[in-house]
Amino acid sequence: MIRQGRWLGIVSAVLLAVCLAFSKGGDAIPAVRAVGDLDGDGKPEEYSLAGHSLTVTEGGQVIWRSAGDWRVDSFALGDVNNDGTDDLALSLWKTGSFGTLRPFWQTGEDTSYKNHLFVFKLQEDTFKSVWCSSDLDCPIVSFAIRDVDGDGRSELVVEEGQYRRIAGERYALALDSPLRTAVWQWEEWGFRLRRLD
């Protein structure tokens, strides 16, 4: 009985640590790896997400790493903008939406820490931004790039949650929030909502 109680205590402590790490934005996610050839040069790139940082290598050389102030929680490879070549899509958390160039209605510094979706294209071993969202109304829980309706065009299928305020303008995913599925499709410059379940 003492051994069972001890193991139950250890398991409970581990589960508590994992839950706390997730709720505080910790690095509790396991490493995720993928292989793709986004630039079509016949040399596959390796994508590795570990410790909320995404690293891309080709032939053992690092060709790209996510910015140090981004907290990347997931990524997908696929033709999200339907131009015939695969893209890198990232769900990430960062401070601010606009950087140094701001729209006219944004008068002060944007210090909110929220979820964003960024899309990159790989050309000649250089990642170029295709689309970088402002902070999202609903944070991404998970997402995939696939043809949902059979029309031959990819959609971005997103499971969305809700934010919870941590402190000031810093937010995290509310783990107990209801989820909804949104289906988005690329149109010219950005995504248009096709369906919300």
Where does each model-flagged region fall?
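Beta-propeller-forming repeat regions
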Residues: I2-D197
